[in-house]
């Protein structure tokens, strides 16, 4: 399988391109609103030192995207492919956020559809992992056709939070 984790994907509203180290300041500006993270398991990700960990992990993953509003040319969020499992014909899409001005409309739907269309040229199943208390993201998963799959404890020492898994199949 030759799954390209960071292609450039272009729709009417957004372009997804590989996230670069030089994107930190603009992406942090997009992420610095505490309300973006209020239901997220990492609720302090709006703080620069916490966001730096997220950003470094995104760069290291070699599957992260900068999400760009095609009208303004500005970075409005990020998402990534993660946890590619060729034997199971599966990949995860996650670590996604958008600025609040882009919530509730077509931006998330188009971003995810671009990623799904690309993924389904290589795999049969796409998995999304959402924090149990992140009801906003769970509703967004349902809007794009995600089906509840399972619930598991969130990994990490001392974590008592649960993750909810959604799946979309080709």
Spell out what each predicted region is.
Residues 129, 147-163:
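Conserved catalytic-core motifs of GNAT/GCN5-like acyltransferases
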């Amino acid at each position: 399988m030759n799954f390209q984790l960071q292609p450039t994907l272009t729709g009417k509203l957004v372009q997804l391109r590989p996230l670069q180290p030089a994107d930190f300041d603009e992406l942090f500006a997009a992420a610095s609103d505490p309300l973006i993270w209020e239901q997220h398991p990492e609720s302090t990700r709006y703080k620069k030192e916490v966001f730096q960990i997220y950003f470094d992990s995104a760069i290291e993953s070699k599957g992260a995207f900068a999400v760009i509003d095609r009208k303004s040319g500005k970075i409005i969020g990020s998402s990534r492919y993660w946890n590619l499992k060729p034997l199971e014909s599966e990949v995860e899409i996650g670590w996604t956020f958008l600025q609040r001005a882009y919530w509730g409309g077509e931006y998330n739907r188009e971003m995810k559809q671009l990623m799904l269309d690309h993924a389904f040229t290589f795999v049969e199943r796409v998995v999304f992992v959402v924090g149990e208390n992140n009801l906003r993201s769970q509703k967004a998963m349902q809007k794009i056709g995600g089906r509840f799959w399972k619930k598991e404890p969130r990994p990490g020492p001392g974590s008592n939070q649960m993750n909810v898994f959604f799946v979309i199949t080709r």
